[in-house]
Amino acid sequence: MTGILPTYQRFVNGVPVPSISRRSFRLREKYLIVSVLLTFGIVWLGALFYLPEFKSSNSVNDSVYNVYKRIQKAGPELLMPPPLAQNDVGDFPVIGIAHHGEGGDDPHVIEDRNRLRAKIEEDMGMKVLERPQFDVAPSVSSSRGPSKPPVDAIEEPAVGNNAANKDVSPSGPKAESSDKFVAVALAPGADPEIKHKLETVKKMMLHAWYNYKLYAWGKNELKPMSKRAHLSSVFGAGELGATIVDGLDTLYLMGLNDEFREGRDWVAEHLHINEIDSDLSVFETTIRFVGGLLSCYALTGDTMFRDKAAEVGDALLPAFDTPTGLPYALINPSTKASRQYHWAGPNSILSELGTLHLEFTYLSDVTGRDIYRQKVSRIREVLDQIDKPGDLYPNFINPRTGQWGQRHMSLGALGDSFYEYLLKAWLMSGGADEQARIMFDTAMQAALDKMLRVSPSGLAYLAELKYGRIIEEKMDHLSCFAGGMFALASTTLDNSMSERYMDVAKKLTNTCHESYARSETKLGPEAFRFSNAAEARAQKSNEKVYLLRPETFESYFIMWRLTKQQMYRDWAWEAVQALEKHCRVEGGYTGLVNVYHANPQGDDVQQSFFLAETLKYLYLIFGDDSFLPLDEWVFNTEAHPFPIRGKNPLYRAVDKPVLPEPAHAQNNRI
């Protein structure tokens, strides 16, 4: 029948043209298409089940949720960058950009941002987290290792390693309802006004933490006005989470358990210092990271913190490879290369190499690795044996030759915390480190004789020396820690120097308060001078800044604990009110460019030490004396509390190594 059906053929200029369309594929083409689709399906399914997020989860639903959490942690800026505010882009003004409404934010963007924030809060509110005092096992998985530590990761304090046999918690007696050590800042029935002040500081911590989490999570610090990460901080752009590590023990002490847990989990999963390929300050990394991690280990017993502290300590060891054992200032954890600051020439800084002793000694005691103690003991020996001009220590020393640089001496910048750590090393050792105490008292007698000055109106201050002479009649804000230092020294002596130390402590703390009281913002400048024209006031523009510093509040806290004079609490509350009025912004807390302006401009940096130190000391001053008692705890220069050996069973010293010897030590022995 087909033979009689008509056929049709197209012709162009009489030439037949073949048809270019078919209604079906040839059999071979069908097989090829099916094969491609089948291969694609197999690859897709394989990828689905071998992604790290899916391998570490028990169910597909959990895996999807984990992926969602990863996106969430990236922060709202990933999905919706914040709008330009105040006609600014970054640090540079932009002319002619119009914004709607107050503050320069587009109302549509504000509505979208509020919806996103509400969604994040709703999702975070769904979490049910255990109190960290009872269980600090990680709640997130990591592709780098097991998702949970062994059951015995939480260690009870080894009372046998300490002279004291009593139950001691961060707040004093061990809570009856728990076999862990729980922090309680105020006893039941406390004064409602004091409780209100304590809660105010806690809310400040939450405001600082929440905005860091929202705009800079995992980065080092926050720009609270720009609402983005601060990439030019002391730790640069590397994702070390400096604010997280620095603020963790403050969260714990304030009882902010959910926030502590999320910070703890970030450290467990993301803090890998050996991946950082940039120069880090040995000093800053030690006091903030090693110090912060060891403090959390002492408070909680979570061995993750101890192990991370050892990891960071190991990364710093190559900086000590010098002819004298005095470390270089900077270390690249990835390449292991170390160097000095360009501005310091061949020299290391006294306050940096001399402010490692607490952290490295304690790290040796809790890990059983003696190498850390060996490094700082070598520094101590060099500084003890070297010739000291007038019994004081110049700020610069060459680690290759062991010779002093410029004969510039200070209890402020470049020198301050070296002297602080001589006293605190003796305190933390339970009085066993006699060398440190002798070095401290000898240096302080020289400092009081040569640096202590009194202004025409009677204000005491610590000036700076160069070649034995006063070079400037000024005092740094950094020196304001000295009031607390001299007070601690006074209460631990039983001789004629004790009374003099306490007298100096009161006078210096009063002077630092005057530098606050004489500014329009009631916050203190970076440095202040003394002359007939003006006293306790800054004169140069770069001295008029306030960087959210804690040193004055540290002295308020210690002076309150040791004297019980109400004015120290009153001064602290004045500072809280000033911080809330001038430094608080929608995106956190900012430093100030000029403390003498009634409406000062912000510097747009929320320093990590604002959470670690400033807020911690302001919180502690309104707490009970049994909350971190000073006869059982000593604070490192970043306000991380360390237990005192022989007086606090949370010291957790071990008799033998609990971690393998670091590779650097093995290589040096070879």
From Swiss-Prot:
Task: Show the active-site residues.
Answer: E526
A Gene Ontology molecular function term for this protein is:
calcium ion binding
Q: Which pathway features in its UniProt record? A: Protein modification; protein glycosylation
Q: What is this protein called?
A: Mannosyl-oligosaccharide alpha-1,2-mannosidase IA
Q: Please list every transmembrane segment annotated in the UniProt record, as residue ranges.
A: 31-51
Activity regulation details: Strongly inhibited by 1-deoxymannojirimycin, an inhibitor of class I alpha-mannosidases, and by EDTA. EDTA inhibition is reversed by the addition of calcium, but not of magnesium.
Give the positions annotated as glycosylation sites. N61
Q: What is its EC number?
A: 3.2.1.113
Q: Output the Gene Ontology cellular-component terms.
A: endoplasmic reticulum; Golgi apparatus; Golgi membrane
Q: Which residues bind Ca(2+)?
A: T637
Q: Which GO BP terms, alphabetically?
A: carbohydrate metabolic process; N-glycan processing; protein glycosylation
Topology, Lumenal side: 52-670
Needs which cofactor? Ca(2+)
